């Protein structure tokens, strides 16, 4: 009799409800949600075996991600049609050059021209520069990394850091 009473008294008021733990996704999942923009870079990250590495919940990252057009232009400059022609080691170095294992928010990123305080996973320094008004620049539309990669989007938040979108691939 007691068992019947206990079973009847167990009603879950949240039964059937869906709960979201995070309203943002980890870095690689975010890129996949925008595959129309980043499918080429996702392919490079997977080929380099670094795609899942930037999905870790216990680590913080800042990713500088070239869009598909930027990756295609990079291939053209290198005289190849895919990352496989350059090899796995090259791909790992390339992806590592585009990742900082720490967070850099937008305010810190644009704070001053010059070297970012944190180094990339490949232990390189990235330099922030601002285009001049005389060259059609000025403001947020004229921010570059290493004077070669135009920053198109700043500090898109992900659950484990930030994603910056580049109009050029860092080399």
Residue positions per predicted region:
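Envelope-exposed proteins and targeting segments
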Residues: 59-62, 124-126, 141, 152-154, ...
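Aromatic/histidine-rich interaction motifs
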Residues: 76-150
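FKBP-type peptidyl-prolyl cis-trans isomerase
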Residues: 64-74, 156-171
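Bacterial Sec-dependent N-terminal signal peptides
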Residues: 6-33
């Amino acid at each position: 009799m007691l068992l019947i009473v206990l079973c009847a008294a167990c009603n879950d008021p949240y039964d059937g409800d869906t709960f979201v733990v995070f309203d943002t996704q980890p870095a690689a999942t975010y890129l996949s949600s925008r595959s129309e923009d980043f499918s080429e870079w996702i392919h490079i990250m997977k080929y380099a075996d670094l795609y899942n590495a930037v999905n870790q919940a216990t680590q913080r990252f800042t990713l500088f991600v070239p869009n598909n057009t930027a990756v295609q232009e990079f291939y053209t400059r290198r005289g190849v049609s895919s990352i496989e022609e350059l090899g796995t080691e090259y791909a790992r170095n390339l992806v590592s050059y585009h990742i900082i294992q720490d967070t850099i928010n937008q305010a810190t990123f644009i704070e001053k021209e010059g070297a970012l305080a944190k180094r990339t996973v490949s232990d390189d320094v990235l330099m922030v520069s601002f285009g001049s008004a005389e060259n059609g620049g000025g403001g947020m539309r004229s921010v570059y990394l290493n004077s070669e990669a135009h920053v198109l989007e700043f500090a898109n938040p992900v659950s484990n850091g930030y994603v910056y979108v580049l109009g050029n691939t860092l080399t």
